[in-house]
UniProtKB/Swiss-Prot annotation:
Keyword Zinc listed: yes
Family of this protein: Belongs to the sugar phosphate cyclases superfamily. Dehydroquinate synthase family.
Compartments (UniProt record): Cytoplasm
Cofactors named for this entry: Co(2+); Zn(2+); NAD(+)
NCBIfam families: aroB
PANTHER family recorded: 3-DEHYDROQUINATE SYNTHASE, 3-DEHYDROQUINATE SYNTHASE, CHLOROPLASTIC
Underlying gene: aroB
GO biological process, alphabetically ordered: amino acid biosynthetic process; aromatic amino acid family biosynthetic process; chorismate biosynthetic process
Species this protein is from: Campylobacter curvus (strain 525.92)
Name of the protein this chain belongs to: 3-dehydroquinate synthase
Length: 346
């Protein structure tokens, strides 16, 4: 299965391959960026399929807390030491953290070299690996330093998902739920009824999510409008992750909580029915995802929104669902209305 992304009025683009890893062929030097856990589980599978002139491995620490400029420096140092040039290629082999960091390193090494995404987590396959968002975190928030830099190809393999821990697998489902709530009511209904034990259903889930992401990115590559709707749940989630030091919740878990918080705000504003909000909450519960976060200080939580990348001139832009299958951006919500919702989570 192949899905094509055409960008900048079809001047360039790339393919997302689903269960076609054997097609991967690269000219020139190749650096595979991964972590010890993924390497131990899946590196041999990749190397058995990879056709390239020369490769070497860059191993980085595992975890969101290492998604920072220090790790980027580590990657760049090894690229320089190994004398990669502009004809070389980086492979991001891992989850969303690896994808984001490798893409960012590729975008700044010698002002840009090729990179390929091979996501090994469900979260990365349904969302993070497609679309060209790259970056790292800092003390001010999540993904505050980064770039838009598209991969040359993406390879999604269902077999890599078999080794995911229960919690990590479910965290990936949060991003699939996000896709469904914002753009695809039929997909939402399918998720309500499907069991994901079968590999064909997993492949269908990835395919459907990638199709949504691809069409959105084609229409709005640099997130000036439509693509911003895919940040549903993330305005709240990024604050939660930053407050908890990126250690208490996996990203998808924080997004699940963020979606529930956003839905509470939507209901209060009359954008969403309580019935739809409950259906979303029940679907998240079906996938054993959290929906509640105990706030310490609602005012401090709100002030953290000011560092959100969508905030402009002191106006917080909230991505809210106005019914399953649809979403809107609102930048005229009163602070008091948001504070009242936040108090429900104390």
């Amino acid at each position: 299965m192949q899905i094509r992304l055409n960008l900048e009025q079809k001047k360039y683009g790339y393919n997302v391959y689903i269960n076609e890893l054997e097609r991967i062929e690269i000219k020139g030097k190749t650096a595979i960026v991964t972590n010890p856990k993924i390497a131990g589980l899946h590196l041999n599978t990749l190397l058995n399929s990879l056709k390239c002139d020369e490769y070497f491995i860059i191993s980085v620490p595992d975890g969101e807390e290492y998604k920072n400029l220090a790790t980027i420096e580590l990657i760049l140092e090894q690229l320089f030491t190994s004398k990669l040039d502009r004809s070389s290629t980086l492979i991001a082999f891992g989850g969303g953290v690896i994808s984001d960091m490798t893409g960012f390193a590729a975008s700044i090494y010698e002002r840009g070299i090729n990179f390929i995404n091979i996501p090994t987590t469900l979260l990365a396959q349904v969302d993070a690996s497609v679309g060209g968002k790259t970056g790292v975190n800092n003390k001010f928030g999540k993904n505050m330093i980064g770039s838009f830099y598209q991969p040359k190809a993406v390879y999604c393999e269902s077999k890599f998902l078999r080794t995911l821990a229960f919690r990590e697998f479910n965290a990936g489902l949060a991003e699939a739920v996000k896709m469904a709530v914002t753009f695809d009511k039929e997909m939402f209904e399918w998720l309500e009824n499907v069991t994901l034990d079968e590999e064909q259903n997993l492949a269908k889930l990835v395919e459907r999510s990638v199709l949504i992401k691809a069409r959105v990115v084609e229409a709005d590559e640099k997130e000036r409008g439509l693509r911003a709707l895919l940040n549903y749940g993330h305005t709240f989630a990024h604050v939660i992750e930053n407050e908890t030091g990126y250690k208490k919740y996996l990203h998808g878990e924080a997004v699940a909580i963020g979606m529930n918080m956003a839905n509470s705000l939507s209901v209060k504003l009359g954008l969403m029915s309580e019935k739809d909000a409950l259906r979303i909450k029940e679907l998240l519960a079906k996938f054993s995802l959290p929906t509640h976060y105990v706030l310490r200080d609602e005012s401090a939580f709100y002030e953290a929104f000011m560092l959100d990348k969508k905030t402009q001139e002191g106006s917080v832009k909230f991505i809210l669902s106005n019914g399953i299958g649809s979403a809107v951006m609102k930048n005229d919500i009163k602070r008091d209305d948001v504070i009242k919702i936040l108090r429900e989570f104390k």
